[in-house]
């Protein structure tokens, strides 16, 4: 009886991180409505990441790929996700696509720039058709994720992976024949002035493909480096501490893809001292 009790306790210990429903929203964009954006392969990432998540117990899964991944559709899916969440749920959000710096209108960034995800219908330059309202800036992303956090409570796990790049302060150009996610030019919004706003707290974990001064280069097969690492290493990442997980992904970067003179390293931000990104993965025998 004692042996059975110990086994039950260990099983419960392994599953404790996965209480509640496991939900996910995956967004991937390759070709954009505005031809000024370079063709990338974020759409391929989306299906690969979705498959990896299903293998790790995410049954409530929404995928937005290509032209359906407009700004309005992404916001709507975030709102649906938040509305369905319950206390203790595990929620995962993934974005593969272009990123861009844009004028920080509300003044919460010391450098004057917001980072943004680029939906399918966003334009690369400020114009009458897009004055910035089609970009998904970090303030909006924060508000959408905060709504999810409020629903799942402090017992829930909220993890985000971003296989994009902003490269706003990088002056180095990528090597020839290398596909890079992100652009050098920022989206400049004319403004008569900015007021100062408090920087919002990041109440989740965000795993990004590279640091904000680095380029995010695709692998030769078109896969995003971070997406490929997560899908390939999923079985090895379960249970790792955050620094160990970052080391594993860095090793994958170094082993795979074209040999490049431009370094790229993953980075994790948010509640790294109290939560583990690896808890999204299920331990396998």
Language model features with spans:
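Short beta->alpha junction loops
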Residues: 62-71
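Signal peptide-proximal N-terminal region
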Residues: 48-61
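Short glycine-rich His-centered loop
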Residues: 21-37
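Active-site-proximal C-terminal subdomain of hydrolase catalytic domains
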Residues: 28, 138, 142, 146, ...
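Boundary at the C-terminal end of the N-terminal hydrophobic targeting segment
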Residues: 17-19
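Bacterial N-terminal signal peptides
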Residues: 5-14
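Glycine- and acidic-residue-enriched helix-capping/strand-helix junction motifs
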Residues: 32-47, 217-222
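Caspase-like (clan CD) cysteine peptidase catalytic core
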Residues: 21, 60, 73-96, 101-175, ...
């Amino acid at each position: 009886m004692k042996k059975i009790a110990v086994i039950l306790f260990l099983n419960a210990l392994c599953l404790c991180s996965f209480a509640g429903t496991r939900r996910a929203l995956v967004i991937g964009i390759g070709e954009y409505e505005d031809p000024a954006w370079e063709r990338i392969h974020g759409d391929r990432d989306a299906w690969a990441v979705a498959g990896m998540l299903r293998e790790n117990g995410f049954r409530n899964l929404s995928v937005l790929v290509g032209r359906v991944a407009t700004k309005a559709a992404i916001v709507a899916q975030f709102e649906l996700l938040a509305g369905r969440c319950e206390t203790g749920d595990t929620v995962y959000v993934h974005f593969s696509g272009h990123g861009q710096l844009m004028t920080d209108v509300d003044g919460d960034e010391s450098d004057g720039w917001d980072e943004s995800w680029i939906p399918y219908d966003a334009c690369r330059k400020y114009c009458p058709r897009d004055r910035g309202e089609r970009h998904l800036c970090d303030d909006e992303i924060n508000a959408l994720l905060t709504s999810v956090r409020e629903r799942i409570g402090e017992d829930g796990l909220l993890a985000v992976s971003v296989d994009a790049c902003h490269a706003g302060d990088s002056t180095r150009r990528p090597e020839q024949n290398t596909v890079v996610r992100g652009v050098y030019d920022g989206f400049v919004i004319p403004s008569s002035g900015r007021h100062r706003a408090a920087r919002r707290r990041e109440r989740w974990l965000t795993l990004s493909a590279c640091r904000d001064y680095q380029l995010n280069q695709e692998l030769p097969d078109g896969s995003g480096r971070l997406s490929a690492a997560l899908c390939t290493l999923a079985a090895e990442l379960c249970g790792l501490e955050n620094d160990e997980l970052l080391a594993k992904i860095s090793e994958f970067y170094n082993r795979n893809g074209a040999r490049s003179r431009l370094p790229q390293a993953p980075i994790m931000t948010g509640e790294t001292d109290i939560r583990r990104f690896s808890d999204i993965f299920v331990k396998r025998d």
